[in-house]
Regions:
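Conserved catalytic core of two-metal-ion nucleotidyltransferases
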Residues: 4-28, 73-132, 151-249, 254-270
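Helical (often loop-to-helix) elements that flank the catalytic cores of nucleotide-handling enzymes
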Residues: 70
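Short, His- and charge-rich active-site/binding loops that engage polyanionic ligands
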Residues: 142
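Mobile amphipathic helical/loop "lid" adjacent to a hydrophobic cofactor/ligand pocket
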Residues: 147-148
Length: 270
């Protein structure tokens, strides 16, 4: 059995920054309305780059810009490609992401090691319309996470069969799981695109972990300024202080040591 070689944290960050730099180049070339978001925005403002105990890179952009990004991404790739844009499930959410094709990850939860297909990545959050009422958003958000929960159940039901006589059953189980997973991911993505960005006054990304109380505003994508993230010039909302205070409160104050937690995965070379 091939032994996996874990990737040091510094190398993971370098890989992510290589992906990020390429994404920024594409977005600037095609004049896409992207911003760095969530912990990445917080890291840029408070630390000038990564939050010391984390290595996330999150980008968000309106749906129409994301569709353009998706269309031109492969044309901007080197040959052979170093990165690829993927949609569908990543861990336990339906977030599009860009991955380094030469790496993989192992997720460690409750003492179990679970291998996932994705690699070192950068998340891309498409932003859509939030609906026309608070009820629209609440109902659509609940439906999205209902579908995501079904995909989690599918992952949870999977058990490999060590007995060779049962491997045919395993093959069919895998096929059925794949079909069910595809169904629920598609339904989740349909929820995300239910309301048009331009037709709605309020906007939202259903894949956010912050719930329906997250306050996203069109001005964040229309009025942007440059900011450095680990030496890479990228776009942030001019009103970044307002956005960060909405999400984190007094974001300049560091959290207690026990709450400074990063990911629960271990990246490795394929």
């Amino acid at each position: 059995m091939k032994t996996r070689k874990e990737i040091p944290d510094e190398e993971v960050r370098k890989m992510e920054l290589d992906i990020f730099s390429h994404v920024v180049t594409i977005c600037e070339k095609y004049k896409l309305r992207y911003i760095i978001d969530y912990g990445t925005l917080l890291g840029a403002v408070r630390h000038g780059g990564f939050i010391p105990w984390d290595d996330d890179i999150d980008i968000s952009m309106p749906r129409s810009d994301y569709e353009t990004f998706k269309r031109v991404f492969s044309d901007e790739m080197t040959s052979p490609p170093q990165n690829e844009l993927r949609t569908g499930m990543k861990g336990n959410n339906a977030i599009p992401y860009i991955q380094d094709v030469h790496t993989g990850t192992v997720t460690e939860k409750k003492g179990r090691r679970e291998k996932y297909a994705q690699s070192v990545w950068v998340d891309v959050f498409p932003v859509d319309g939030a609906g026309y009422t608070k009820e629209d958003l609440a109902e659509n958000y609940a439906e999205y996470w209902k579908n995501i929960e079904e995909t989690r159940k599918i992952f949870g039901r999977y058990k490999p069969y060590p007995n060779p006589m049962k491997q045919i059953r395993q093959f069919y189980d895998h096929h059925i799981r794949s079909l069910c997973l595809e169904k629920y991911v598609k339904q989740a993505e349909e929820c995300m695109k239910k309301y048009d960005y331009d037709a709605c006054e309020n906007i939202f990304c259903l894949a956010t972990i912050y719930g329906t109380k997250e306050k996203n505003r069109k001005e964040y994508y229309e009025d942007r300024i440059d900011m450095e993230f680990e030496g890479i010039t990228c776009k942030v909302p001019r009103a970044y202080d307002r956005k960060l205070r909405d999400m984190y409160g007094n974001y300049h104050e560091l959290p207690p040591t026990e709450k400074r937690k990063g990911h629960d995965f271990v990246p490795y070379y394929r």
